[in-house]
Amino acid sequence: MDPQQWLLLEVSLEAIQHAGLVPGQSLARDTGVFIGISTDDYKASQLYSSDLSRIGTYTGSGCMYSAAAGRLSYWLGLQGPNKAVDTACSSSLVALHDACQAIRHGECSTALVGGVNLLLTPHLFVCFSALGALSPDGVCRAFADGANGYVRGEGCGVLVLKSRAQAEADGDQILALIAATAVNQDGTSSNLTAPNGAAQQQVMRTALQRAGVSAAQVGYVETHGTGTSF
């Protein structure tokens, strides 16, 4: 089984416990699961290996993105919407947006939202190096004159989401509020993998408008970028 699936199970249980919830009891059965996942190193090493003896009964389900999300609902007995999201670097944020929409539309009362990324083989490193996307000296200098590429990273994170009204009614500890989310796409840019500044500005304006917040009120910004002159 893809270690990313193992990690999601472990971190999801940690998130549920940290939220003071118990699967099968206080964790609602209609809880949705939304997982951002876009790296398939383990799948490539198992299913696409020339050694077919490495493929077993559960290799397929152990490698599928859909199973990374589905396994959580299976083990936790959850019957809300379930989806794995692959939008490359934005996968977990788009999963978060989808979860917020599902809660707002009454599709689930609670949502597990997560993202996972493990780097298990050299193949994508070679690909991104050929593309010129990786920093040759292993340092990401986003927004700096000397920016020469980004650095890949690993990790896993899971959040437990509810509407504010539901969380307050349940007496939950609220760590943060999501004022609004927004999603769009670059459309046409200089090339397929290059960002479109105008489109990115528009999605931020949309999120601010939905939240009823002005740009001047924002005190902290966390961004994702290419770490290059783009």
Which stretches of residues belong to each language-model region?
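Condensing-enzyme catalytic core of the thiolase-fold
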Residues: 1-230
